[in-house]
């Protein structure tokens, strides 16, 4: 069985091949989310605590949280479910998934280091992989660098170098939700436009109501005139 060990603190991970079945037997009958002492796996993991996060069986079917079985099952999966990515809107599909209980049929078991042990693990705890991309949203940049609202966020955007052919240049993401004078001016314009449109609609409605009242009065007067003429003709 292969153990895929991840250390989120440093952003590293490494796959370790374990040929001795007795060493991985400690994981059997354990579920996703449970924690295991690393000393039971080997002396190099003394003091470590691992958390089971998933895995794949020998045929490549992924483990699914919540399926309390050590075998494969077929489930009707939709958008939002793990182990399935819908290709069309509203699509559902019956897929084979592996249960969340660890067994000997697994090819890869994913672990996360919850507690670091005495020895350093080569390529995992002794190395650091920096984040390639920094925060994009203005508030997230402020939180990341501990800035106040008075500080200019644009000076703190994390830029990265890009080499295209022989030319090297820096690239920065577009800051989202950045409040600038142009944005405030645009908001003011939109608000004023909304007020003007509402005012124009009210004026048009008042004008229409006035015209309608005038037409009704004319029709009423016309009917009264017709009745008057008819009455005078009957008298004659």
Curated annotation (Swiss-Prot):
Kindly list the positions at which Phosphoserine occurs in this protein.
Answer: 232-233
How is this protein annotated for GO cellular component?
Answer: fungal biofilm matrix; ribonucleoprotein complex; ribosome
Q: Name one Pfam family in it.
A: Ribosomal_S6e
GO BP annotations, alphabetical order:
translation
Keyword entries, A-Z:
Phosphoprotein, Ribonucleoprotein, Ribosomal protein
Gene Ontology MF, one: structural constituent of ribosome
Q: In what way is this protein post-translationally modified?
A: Phosphorylated.
Q: Which SMART domains does its entry note?
A: Ribosomal_S6e
Q: Which protein family is named in the record?
A: Belongs to the eukaryotic ribosomal protein eS6 family.
Protein name per the record? Small ribosomal subunit protein eS6
């Amino acid at each position: 069985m292969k153990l895929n060990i991840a250390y989120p603190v440093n952003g590293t991970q490494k796959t370790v091949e374990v040929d001795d079945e007795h060493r991985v037997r400690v994981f059997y009958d354990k579920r996703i989310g449970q924690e295991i002492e690393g000393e039971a796996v080997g002396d190099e993991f003394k003091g470590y605590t691992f958390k089971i996060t998933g895995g794949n069986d020998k045929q490549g079917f992924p483990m699914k949280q919540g399926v309390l079985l050590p075998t494969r099952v077929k489930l009707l999966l939709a958008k939002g479910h793990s182990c399935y990515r819908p290709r069309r809107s509203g699509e559902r599909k019956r897929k084979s998934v592996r249960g969340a209980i660890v067994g000997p049929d697994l090819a890869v078991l994913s672990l996360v280091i919850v507690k670091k042990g005495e020895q350093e693990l080569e390529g995992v705890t002794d190395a650091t992989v920096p984040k390639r991309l920094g925060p994009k949203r203005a508030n997230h940049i402020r939180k990341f660098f501990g800035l106040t609202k008075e500080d200019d966020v644009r000076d703190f955007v994390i830029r990265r170098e890009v080499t295209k052919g022989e030319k090297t240049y820096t690239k920065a993401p577009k800051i989202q939700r950045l409040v600038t004078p142009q944005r405030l001016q645009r908001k003011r314009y939109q608000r004023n436009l909304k007020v003007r449109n509402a005012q124009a609609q009210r004026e048009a409605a008042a004008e229409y109501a006035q015209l309608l009242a005038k037409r009704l009065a004319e029709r009423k007067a016309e009917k009264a005139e017709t009745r008057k003429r008819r009455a005078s003709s009957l008298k004659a």
